Amino acid sequence: VSMENGARNGEKLRAGVLSMARDGAERGLVESAFLDWLEDECRVGFPWSMIDKITPHPSERVQEELGRLGVADMAIARTNTGTLIAPFVNAEITEYLVLEDAFPNGRPALEGAGVYLTDRTTVEKAEKMKVGTCLNPLHTALAVYGCLLGYTSIAAEMGDADLKALVEHIAAESLPVVEDPGIL
């Protein structure tokens, strides 16, 4: 299952896996029977997914908490391009995973963990709603203008009446053109 947050991610994962397997077959590293098995969609599934879980830059608060718990070597570093990196990932609590229920060999009870299992069309609608209309454009607008105004978090930006009004206006213009996926 691809957790890459992009359109048709299962299709892209399948293409990548098959490309590597075909290359392996051409080199004599993979038997043709394995390649046939891998290409059989009745045997191997590459379901599409849409995940929504914001993972901001590494938090010093999370780093300190990990240190208190005895977890070593959790230093936050800055790359040559200015990106903050760390051996841990902190994330917002809110999360959504919409997953195409396309598992030809069965699957665990993912719905018990809050996963939305549905058909491919609904996954695609949810992805378009998030990426193209209801979340990413709003977040991007806040990020750009917030940075220009000196803010360091989306939460702080939402406390600014002008930025909040901007986001509400963008949302009001966007919502009429989005197709409700029927979930979320």
What are these regions, as identified by a protein language model?
Residues 1-184:
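Substrate/ligand-engaging "lid" and interaction regions
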